Amino acid sequence: MYLNQKLRGSLTKRCGERRNVMNDRMIKVNILGEQKEYPYGTTYEKIVQEYQSKYEYPIILLMKDCKLCELHKKLKKEGTIEFITTQDQIGYETYRRSVSLLLLKALHYVGGYDNIRKVTMHYSVSSGYYYTIDGDIVLDEKFLSKVKAYMLELVERHVPILKRSVGTEEAMELFHNHKMYDKEKLFYFRRVSRVNIYSLEEYEDYFYGFMASHTGYLKHFDLYLYDDGLVLQLPKRESPNEVPPFAPRPKIFQVQKESAQWSETIQADTVGDLNERITKEGANNLILIAEALQEAKISQIAEQIVQAGNRKFIMIAGPSSSGKTTFSHRLSIQLAAHGMKPHPIGVDNYFVNREDTPLDSNGNYNFECLEAIDVKQFNEDMSALLRGEEVELPRFNFKTGLREYKGDFLKLGEEDVLVIEGIHCLNDKLSSSLPSESKFKIYISALTQLNIDEHNRIPTTDGRLIRRIVRDARTRGASAKATIGMWNSVRRGEEENIFPYQESADVMFNSALIYELAVLKLYAEPLLFSITKEEPEYAEAKRLLKFLDYFLGVPSESIPSNSILREFVGNGCFDV
């Protein structure tokens, strides 16, 4: 049935009048405790321009009533606005993601779209990202200088970064046409009906998270040739307007490269690849292969220790949730298989009494600084053991906050070694009285081998945070909200106390398992869903939930009882 022409004209007129009324009305918002009014449809970018002078660093996103918004969006409802700068974690990641888009556009423009088959973002190097290029180009200083010059030109022009929503099928077709086969495979397993595509002029791509509204925000970066590719060097979060000097760490880079090469060998270097293997073969075989690889690596480390000769102190350090405790147990078993007598010691047992623990800037106990350890007593005990004396070792009572002695005596024989685990173990200030030739240093971290796709990496800190959320809930009854809330403090402690010493290690061990996020997903999702949108941790919880949604879930029944992953999901054979 069709409306007659007169009625249709009347309805059109009334709808137009209603739109005009909407467009003419003022919208009230609360900003920094002030009530402000703006015309309906004002862009958030225009509002930001009014307040930018109050902030030291660029405002790159905002929060409207607990919901993240990009600055090209328009104001349509009343509410509260909070600004997010490039020094805030979410804003900082938005900046890094946006510069990555800028680089990809420049590489294809300078190199020629027909000449570049694939650009892959791999892992973090120095303060940036390591990329490789597969194509008919010569990657040298001349090419890199042209790319950088074009990036700076785009920054100067303030080119809009546009966003459009398309159906998943259309997105997959677009990815296929652009030869982004990793993305095409990834979205085959996605349950969402629509996908956000970002474009910078003619270059189109998908990114895991929000972007800057235009290239004018992206002033701070540098490019360096490194290994077989290039590094996009970016600011650190604490100083987002400064690009630090390029300072690669060759040992950790080599471990990351070896892990990535292994993932490529088994054809599972992206989340789409992993999901495909799970659907076609099941996860059991992949679990067994990954666990066998780790066991072989641990055995190799044990052999290196034996061959090094007379190393009485095996010093193990690594960031939070790297699996240090399970690793030390498995290494001890391998050492025993080589005829040695390992004795595990936790540096935590040498904490000073609670009342003597230093405080951080917020007045909370700082258990992560070196001063929280009784370094003098630790050195006296270790030196005495090295001299062949019998020593009574302490146990720290975490309930009373006191160090206790309960007759735990130890004397080292010829085959005895101490397997010492603690965040400061690579710092020679902890063991200054021990000869360097008596120590064998091991750095352990969960260096995720997988990428989401060729242009979206998985930060190693995300894998460790998800491990920590699952373990804290199981062992301490801690909420995901509490774990997320203290994570930045943990990260600051790692930056100060662990990462500066990692290159001093004799050997490095990657504890990440290629299948682990598919398992952790089933444990972490219910915990993350418990965080409500009114809580400050909601944005991070929502980001992690979106991230985990890329993975197909895998039950934990097939995981061996001695797996490092058991330290987090439970039912392991070690007392950790």
Question: Where do the PLM segments sit?
Answer:
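Short, contiguous acidic and Ser/Thr-rich linear segments
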Residues: L32-T42
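Short beta-strand-centered segment that lines the nucleotide-binding/catalytic pocket of NTP-utilizing
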Residues: A337-E355
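Conserved NTP phosphate-binding and transfer environment spanning the P-loop NTPase/kinase superfamily
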Residues: G309, S431-V576
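Auxiliary tRNA-acceptor-end handling modules of aminoacyl-tRNA synthetases
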Residues: K73-K76, T80-T94, A106, V110, ...
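Hydrophobic anchor at the beta1->P-loop junction of P-loop NTPases
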Residues: I314-I316
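Conserved nucleotide-sensing/catalytic segment adjacent to the nucleotide-binding pocket
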Residues: D356-K399
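Hydrophobic positions on the alpha1 helix immediately C-terminal to the Walker A/P-loop
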Residues: F327, L331
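Conserved lysine of the Walker
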Residues: K324
